């Protein structure tokens, strides 16, 4: 994809009845007209709080971390030939309930980027070529943190907190003293 993008917050909020009609009629063009595209690059991070409407453009591989209490409402019912089952569209609560979830305040494009883009801050380095960057910390979101670890050569990750690791490039070995595992992009 030449110009990947996301939608984040309504730049031109629809009224609730107009929004309901757009969803019921699956008028994707009208839905998209409520947003401006935010160009994104590999490695960027955005923190999008619950209630803020958002969508992911084509060709983006991403990790989405959600709080267990987050509600997932789908505007679009069909994508790439897959039709979302009716029970998965509105959490079995109906469209009228789900329309109450959204923040309808206008969010100018530059404010969306400034407010919700998370700039990496170096957090620590490890011997041998490892660095960890803070992407999202408790002062911005008290429920979870998000960090990026980058290894350019053999290094030792030092930490005692639980984590989920996703390898996006390169390969390596994870050895916790009890188990040794080779990892590469998207391995399990």
Predicted feature residues:
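Active-site region of the double-stranded beta-helix
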Residues: 1-42, 57-171, 175-181, 185
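Conserved "cap/hinge" positions at secondary-structure junctions
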Residues: 47-50, 58
């Amino acid at each position: 994809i030449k110009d990947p993008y996301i939608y984040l917050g309504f730049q031109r909020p629809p009224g609730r009845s107009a929004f309901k009609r757009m969803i019921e009629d699956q008028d994707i063009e009208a839905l998209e007209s409520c947003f401006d595209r935010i160009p994104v690059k590999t490695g960027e991070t955005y923190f999008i709080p619950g209630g803020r409407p958002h969508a992911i453009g084509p060709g983006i591989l991403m990790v989405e971390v959600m709080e267990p209490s987050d509600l997932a409402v789908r505007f679009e019912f069909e994508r790439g030939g897959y039709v979302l089952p009716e029970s998965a569209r509105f959490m079995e609560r109906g469209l009228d309930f789900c329309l109450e979830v959204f923040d309808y305040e206008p969010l100018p494009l530059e404010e969306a980027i400034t407010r919700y883009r998370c700039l990496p801050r170096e957090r620590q380095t490890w011997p041998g070529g490892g660095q960890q960057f803070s992407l999202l910390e408790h002062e911005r979101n008290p429920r979870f943190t998000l960090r990026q670890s980058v290894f350019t050569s053999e290094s030792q990750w030092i930490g005692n907190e639980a984590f989920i690791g996703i390898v996006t490039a390169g390969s390596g070995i994870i050895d916790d003293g009890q188990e040794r595992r080779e990892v590469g992009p998207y391995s399990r």
